[in-house]
Amino acid sequence: ARGICLRARGTAGRLHACYKLAQNVMEYSSGIATRTAEMSAAARAVNPAVHVAVTRKHFPGAKALSLKAALAGGASLHRLGLSDSILAFDQHRIFADDFIALIPKMAAAFPEKKIEAEAESPEEAMGYLRAGIDMVQCERFAPAELAAFVKEAKAEFPRAVIAAAGGINAANAAEYAATGVDVLVTSWVYFGKPEDIKMKFSRA
C-alpha cells in the first residue's frame, strides 16, 4: 500500500539525527508484521479457528518491537517469558527420572499455570495428554502424521490444546492448519526481508 505512515517536523539537524533509525525500525517491524499477516491468512483460509503464535526467538534486544509487530500482523504470543506457563522441552525432561509422573504434581503445585510439553512422536504426545497435560506441542510431525494424531487426541481429550511446531512458515502453514491443530508455533516471521519504506525531505 502507498501512503504516508509517519510524518515528522523539525530542524534539518534534528531530522537527520533520527530519521535513519526511525526508517530502519519501521522497515524491520513492518517486515515482521507482513510475514505474520501472510502466514495467518494462509492458515486461516483452511482453518479459521487456528492461531499463529510467535515464540521468544526474536533478535536479542528487540523483544518489544518484534512482539508488537507480530501482534499487528495478527499473531498471538506463545509465551512472553519463562514465568507465564510451564513448557517442558527435551532438555528439561532429561533431568527427570519420570516426567509423566511429574505432570499431575506440577498441576497440583501450580493450579493457575498451563502445563505444556514438547513431543517428538504421537505416542509421546498421547502419553502426556493421558497424564493430564493441558497442551502438547508436536515437534516436526509430518502433516499426515499430525492429522491422524489430532483426530485421535481430540476424540479422547476434546479440551486439549494441540500445537504444531518446527519449520512452520507461510509456505506450509495451510497444510499444517488443515490437520486441525489449535495453534501453529513459529519463529519464522522474525527472519526475512525488511519492508521497503521510502523517506523524503521537504522544506516548510
How should each PLM-predicted stretch be described?
Residues 140, 166, 187-188:
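Short secondary-structure boundary segments
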Residues 142, 153-154, 169, 175-177:
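Catalytic-pocket segment enriched in acidic/His residues
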Residues 155-161, 203-204:
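Short acidic, glycine/proline-enriched helix-loop-strand junctions
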Residues 195-203:
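Structured adenosyl-cofactor binding patch, chiefly the S-adenosyl-L-methionine
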